[in-house]
């Protein structure tokens, strides 16, 4: 089928699937380096399964039921601030929709192209749907840099996020450090670097 169906209301099916797709992409890259072209092709194709979850109505990823239909009723903001969310772990559709690091340009095409992608991504920040304490969306500020002429957005947002969410106080990082994830994000960002 190419997707993980939703078995129960709060089963994290979309979150799990997205991690599988990133792993499949990594396996395709490894297989290619090993000269296993058929395996590389298989894993690369599987890594594109995220497209099954894309819902044009909302412009986000959306859980799919066992029957192969989009989950209803659906609110892409449900699950904000770590509240339970259908299909997503510790987040919502906005925290996960852009979590396709291996196919950013493919996701942009699904969304209608560069302008639509950039506008929608900017709205994630403008409307308070970005969660700096949640790993799936911590790369979001850097996605603007993938598109020529939009790099300034990355520079502006990273500067603002560092000033707002990272301090020298005991609670100076958003959420918890999750084995160094948040502090590493801050250090890379302060240096003006971000691993791709």
Residue ranges and their predicted role:
Residues 1-196:
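Active-site core of glycosidic bond-cleaving carbohydrate-active enzymes
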């Amino acid at each position: 089928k190419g997707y993980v169906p939703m078995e129960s209301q709060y089963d994290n099916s979309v979150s799990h699937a997205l991690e599988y797709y990133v792993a499949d992409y990594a396996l395709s890259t490894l297989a290619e380096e090993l000269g296993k072209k058929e395996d590389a092709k298989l894993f690369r194709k599987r890594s594109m399964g995220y497209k099954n979850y894309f819902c044009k109505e909302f412009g986000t990823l959306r859980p799919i039921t066992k029957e192969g239909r989009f989950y209803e009723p659906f609110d892409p903001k449900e699950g904000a601030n770590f509240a339970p969310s259908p299909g997503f772990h510790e987040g919502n559709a906005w925290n996960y929709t852009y979590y396709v690091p291996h196919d950013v340009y493919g996701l942009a095409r699904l969304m209608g192209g560069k302008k639509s992608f950039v506008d929608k991504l900017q709205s994630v920040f403008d409307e308070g749907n970005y969660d700096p304490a949640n790993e799936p969306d911590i790369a979001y500020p850097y996605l603007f840099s993938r598109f020529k002429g939009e790099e300034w957005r990355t520079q502006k947002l990273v500067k603002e996020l560092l000033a707002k969410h990272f301090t020298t106080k005991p609670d100076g990082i958003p959420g918890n450090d999750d084995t160094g994830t948040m502090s590493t994000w801050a250090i890379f960002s302060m240096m003006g670097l971000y691993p791709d």
